[in-house]
Amino acid sequence: MAKVSLEKDKIKFLLVEGVHQKALESLRAAGYTNIEFHKGALDDEQLKESIRDAHFIGLRSRTHLTEDVINAAEKLVAIGCFCIGTNQVDLDAAAKRGIPVFNAPFSNTRSVAELVIGELLLLLRGVPEANAKAHRGVWNKLAAGSFEARGKKWVSSATVIWYAIGHSG
């Protein structure tokens, strides 16, 4: 059978910005050992040096893969964005080189939905206003004007607008 790939120890992965340890563990479990891992983002010069012989790069949103950086990557095969977007990658430059760019579009939709629901409850219960008053030394123990979401018919007591765009919508 013909050899269709480099040996696993010859394939270099560059992981920056503290990509989750599960990615590192998965690569190692699959037999890849040539992994360069950085907890933070690299400046342009460091990035150009590290990416020069990398086959794959995994990044989050702080690292910007400009056309100059992509052109410095002599062996780059794919770019993995461990986040929702790809706006940190010059997609045209990657396309010119035939380098696919992947992302994780649903990676935090549950977190965003939970945050929105939590903030909605905070607003409905008047927590920001009560917090501001408490910081000014005012503690209002009266229940007048308070609101609980449970068991309420919101149409009569409040107007709730749920407007969302993107994958969380």
Q: What are these language model-derived features?
A:
Residues 167-169:
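Aromatic pocket-lining residues of Rossmann-like dinucleotide-binding sites
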Residues 97-156, 165:
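Phosphate-binding beta-alpha-beta segment of Rossmann-like dinucleotide-binding domains, i.e.
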Residues 20, 160-165:
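N-terminal Rossmann-fold NAD(P) dinucleotide-binding loop
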Residues 1-102:
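An N-terminal-biased, well-structured beta-alpha scaffold segment characteristic
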Residues 15-16, 154-158:
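Conserved N-terminal Rossmann-fold NAD(P)-binding element of oxidoreductases
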